[in-house]
Amino acid sequence: MSSSQKKAGGKAGKPTKRSQNYAALRKARLPKPPALKVPVAKPTNTILPQTGCVWQSLGTPLSLSSFNGLGVRFLYSFLKDFAGPRILEEDLIYRMVFSITPSHAGTFCLTDDVTTEDGRAVAHGNPMQEFPHGAFHANEKFGFELVFTAPTHAGMQNQNFKHSYAVALCLDFDAQPEGSKNPSYRFNEVWVERKAFPRAGPLRSLITVGLLDEADDLDRH
């Protein structure tokens, strides 16, 4: 039986060392997926309706633990993408409410600015400070919240707006109780209150999470 006949009708032989090495090399060259990927739930109406507002649940319960004892960096970002005949960004008010159950008494600190996709600052600083376009407030019922109005652009009527906003929050575990090796925070849900024209389009959301690698990252304010 010729080699071609063997390939056509014969049984497949065992993979050679060379083919195994090639397969391993090919697998190693494939792009690695993100270390941690959080599924995003479709927006749904919640039990917190308010007149003139749209409440949406943008995530499922999420538990984060610090394996190095330093802290956890939580990055929440969302993209508002809508179109309308006369929609102004100044007519949009967003309120993000983070519902958190800590495993112990800790502190929150904002590590990065809240910026639009083209780099314009929306909010920055400490969670308890006022911002140019927004403010962090302690919320006894939910944890803490960010309230801001989208920046205004003169003469931008009759256009499609697409901006992304991100909030990077650092959970500082300095206040962890003695003997606690892996403190954690549970993000019960992230809510967004959107107040805009009824014809405003959908709100698409993305939640990403990353752990802090170095203690220096905790000092970024």
From Swiss-Prot:
This is Capsid protein. It is found in: Virion. Capsid protein. Binds to the to the 3' end of the nonpolyadenylated viral RNA and is involved in viral RNA translation initiation. Probably binds RNA and plays a role in packaging. It comes from Alfalfa mosaic virus (strain YSMV). The keyword Ribonucleoprotein applies. One of its GO terms (molecular function) is RNA binding. Keywords: Acetylation, Capsid protein, Ribonucleoprotein, RNA-binding, T=3 icosahedral capsid protein, Viral nucleoprotein, Virion. Belongs to the alphamovirus/ilarvirus capsid protein family.
